[in-house]
Amino acid sequence: MKICILYGGISSEREVSINTGKSVYNSIHKEHYVSMFDFDGDYDKLYDNVKDVDLVFIALHGGDGENGTIQKFFESENVKFTGPSAVAAEKAMDKNIAKLICQKNNIPTPNWALDFIIEDGAMSMSDKFISSGFVVKPIDEGSSFGITIFKQAPSESEFRKSIKKARKVSESIMLEEYIEGRELTVSILGNNSLPIVEIIPKGDYYDYESKYTKFQSEYIVPAKIDEEIEELLCAYSLKIHKLIGCVSYSRIDFRLSKDNKIYFLEINTLPGFTDTSLFPKSAKSAGISYGELINKIIKLSI
C-alpha cells in the first residue's frame, strides 16, 4: 500500500508532529511503500505529493491539520486519510463547541466562560467560579500550549499575564473552572475503548514539558479506579467519540474530582503517537504493539 505520512505543519505543535511522523514511519516503512511530506501550508505542493497514494496518514497536530481544513481539502480531492472528517475535526478542535455538545447530552464538564473583559484595571466576568480556581486556555490549541492554571483567584496582573500568554497561540480564549483531582484519559480505537491511563505529572500540572519529556510524568495503565467509574468513563468516551463524529480513533481527557465526579475536558481527534504519548501506552496495555496499532488505524481508514 502506498502511504504518505503528513507531518510537521506550521502550528505551535510542529515539533510534536515531527516526532509523531517519524515514529509512524519507523513502524510501517518495511511493510508499506511510505513517503513523508512536511507540510508548510502550500496546498498545491501537498496535492502533488498525495494524489497517487492509497492513504494519507495525518500526523499533524493543531492548526490546519486538526481544525478541519486539511480534512476538507482531502475530501474535496477524494483523497483517503486517517483521523476525523472535516466536520468532526472542526467540532473537536473548538473546545467550546465540544463542551456544549457534552453539556447538551448530559455529560458533565467544568463550568466555563467566554464573556470576560479587563477594563480600567478591573476584571469583569459573569461566572462565580472565577472567584476560586480556574484555567485560562486557548479554545483551539493542544499540547497545553498557552495554558495557565490558577488554583485560587489571581491578582489582576497575574490574570493579565495569563491572557497575554494564551493569546500568543490563539485569539480565542476561554476560562474554565479548575477541578481538583486526578487526570485520566481514554483512548478509543474503532468502537472499543482501551485501558484507561492515569497521568501523574511531577510538576504542578500536565504541561508541554511533562507531556513530551521522558520521566517528567508517571503513567498508571490501567488506572487504579473503581469498576463503576471505569465503566462510566468508557461509556462517556464512546458516546463523545460518536457525538463528535469520530470513526477510527480518538482520545478523550477527563478530570476525576476528589468526590469521584467525572468531568469531560476535551477530545483529541489526532492524538500524539510519540514515544511518550498516551494512546500507544494504552494500546500496549491491551496487548497491541505500536506497529499493530498503526496498522489497525490504517485498516480502519481504508
Regions found by a protein language model. Give the residues of each.
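Hydrophobic beta-strand scaffold residues
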Residues: 34, 80-81, 109, 134, ...
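Phosphate-binding site of ATP-dependent enzymes
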Residues: 155-238, 256-263
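Glycine-rich phosphate/pyrophosphate-binding beta-alpha loops
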Residues: 143, 202, 268-282
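Active-site nucleotide/adenylate-binding loops and adjacent lid/helix of ATP-dependent enzymes
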Residues: 1-7, 50, 91-176, 180
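ATP-binding N-terminal substructure of ATP-dependent carboxylate-amine bond-forming enzymes
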Residues: 1-87, 91-93, 97, 116-125, ...
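Conserved metal-phosphate-binding beta-hairpin within the catalytic cores
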Residues: 177, 186-188, 241-273, 283
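Short beta-strand-to-turn element immediately C-terminal to the catalytic PLP-Schiff-base lysine
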Residues: 115, 147-153, 188-190, 257, ...
